[in-house]
Amino acid sequence: MITKDALVQVSEIVSHASCPDGIGAAMIATAAYVSTGMRPPPTNFVQYGTRAHDDMVSHPRQLFLDITPPKGRWEEWRGLSPIVLDHHESAMHVVQGLNGVYGDSDHSGAMLAFANVMVPLVSMPSEEFEAWQRFAHLCMVRDTWKTASPDWAEACALAHALLLQGQRWGVNAAIVGKLPLAELLNLGRKLHDKIMRQSKGVVRNSLRRNLSIGSRDVKLAIFNHADGGTVSDIAHYVMDEMPCDIVVAYFYVYEDDDTRCVVSVRSNGAISASDLARSFGGGGQSKAAGFRIAGDMSPNSIIQVVTKRIAELNQ
C-alpha cells in the first residue's frame, strides 16, 4: 500500500511519454497534489527503449507512473524509496523488485495513479473527484484495448485528444483548473472520424500474408503509416475489416540522434503481441505492444524479419 506520507515526499514524477495513458496518469497525480495545496512535483516524460530511459539517473523518492526505472539497472533504485506503478508485462519484475504496485487488465497507468495517488491524497469536491475517476477509467479502457467495452468509443476519443494537446498541456491543465473532460471528448470525436476515413485507404494498401504455423493458419497484415499518433487506431480498423489475426504497423522517428523504426503490434489474441515485442526488446500487453528497431531497415527487410520472428515464436 502506498502511504500518504510517502507521496508527500515525492521529488519527481516520471511518466510514460507519447502515450495517452501516461499523460493521463501524470495529469491525475498532478491534480491530486494540487488538491492538497502542495506544489506538485515536476514531471519528466520518458519513453521505454530510448537513451533517456536507459541512461536515467536515479534520485531519491521518484514516482514512476506507467513506466519503471530501466529494466537492466532497476536495482540502483533500491534504498532510494521510489514509488513504482506500472502494468506492462515486460516490466513486472521491476515493479515487484521495488515493492511497487503492478496493475492488471483493469489497472493501467492512469487507474494505478488514481487508486494509489489521488485516492490517498485527494481533497476536492465529489463531482470533480468522480470526473477524474471517469477519466482514469477511459484511459484504462483504451490502453488495455477493451474493444468490447461500451466506453470504447469515448476512450478512443479521449486518447486522440490527449495526444493532440500534448503531455505538457495535460500537466498544465491539471495544475491550473478543473479537468476539461467534455471538451477533450468533443475534440477527440472529431479526430476519430478523420482517422477512420484515413483507415479505409490503409486497408486497401496493407500487405497481407497467410502464415502456416504448425497446424494453424495465421492471417497477418503489415502497413507503414507516417503518423505514429494514429497508427494504433488504424491497426485496429485493419484487423476488423480485413479481417486478420495480427497487424504490424511501422513508422520512422528521429530520436537519440538517429533514425529509428517504431513498430506497433495489434493482435486478436491468436498470437501474443507482447511476446513478439519482447523478442525485440520492447513490451506491452497480449493484444497491444510495440518495439523499436534500426531505422535503416528497408520495408522489405522489416516484413521479412517480423514474419520470421512470428513463425519462430509460435511453432
Where are these regions (language model features)?
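Accessory alpha-helical/coil subdomains and C-terminal extensions
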Residues: 149-208
